[in-house]
Regions:
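Solvent-exposed loop/turn segments at secondary-structure junctions
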Residues: 1, 28-33, 84-90, 115-116
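Aromatic/hydrophobic pocket-lining residues that form the small-molecule binding cavity
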Residues: 3, 7, 122
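Generic structural signal for well-ordered alpha-helices
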Residues: 7-12, 61, 65
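Loop/turn elements at helix/coil->beta-strand transitions in domains of secreted/extracellular proteins
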Residues: 16-24, 72-79, 136
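Structural recognition of the beta-strand scaffold that forms the well-ordered cores
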Residues: 21-27, 78-83, 116, 124-125, ...
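Substrate-gating cap/lid alpha-helix
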Residues: 31-85, 119-123
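Mobile gating loops/cap/lid regions near enzyme active sites that modulate substrate access
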Residues: 83-113
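Histidine-centered active-site loop/cap adjacent to the catalytic His
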Residues: 102-141
């Protein structure tokens, strides 16, 4: 809720400066799989999402989308860009092969960065931004 409130505040501040400018809010994408989330490290080497499950991360993204939809639905010329539900989060991240556990020779593909997609993910996000722009530009006049 706090993140959504900050986004709504940005919209409010833009509106103070220009009451009619179209505002596009690109919704947060879903992160990679559990192994990517569970092993992603911050710059200092500590785990970024220690103890968190993909379902928790997904729920947070889902709730943020719903909250923004509720809070911004009455705003004129504010458009939500559904990047989260339009990007293939299962296949859009850079991966590397890792052993499934320290005692196994079996490997699996694990996301290197669970938050930021590979170029193909950004292309998918760009496509949905472009589609949203094309679908709403007629309302600008």
């Amino acid at each position: 809720e706090e993140n959504a409130d900050h986004i709504c505040k940005i919209v409010e501040l833009i509106r103070k400066d220009d009451k009619n400018i179209p505002i596009y809010v690109v919704q947060t994408i879903y992160q990679s799989d559990q192994n990517g989330i569970g092993s992603m490290k911050m710059n200092n080497g500590s785990l970024m999402f220690q103890g968190q499950h993909k379902s928790q991360r997904d729920l947070a993204v889902f709730q943020l989308m719903g909250y923004l939809d509720e809070k911004l639905s009455d705003e004129k010329r504010v458009y939500l860009v559904p990047a989260g539900i339009s990007m293939d989060s299962e296949n859009a991240f850079v991966t590397e092969e890792r052993t499934v556990n320290p005692y196994s020779d079996k490997t699996e593909s694990v996301a290197v960065d669970a938050v930021h997609p590979a170029a193909i993910g950004y292309y998918q996000i760009a496509d949905v931004i472009y589609s949203t722009l094309c679908g709403t530009m007629g309302e600008w006049e």
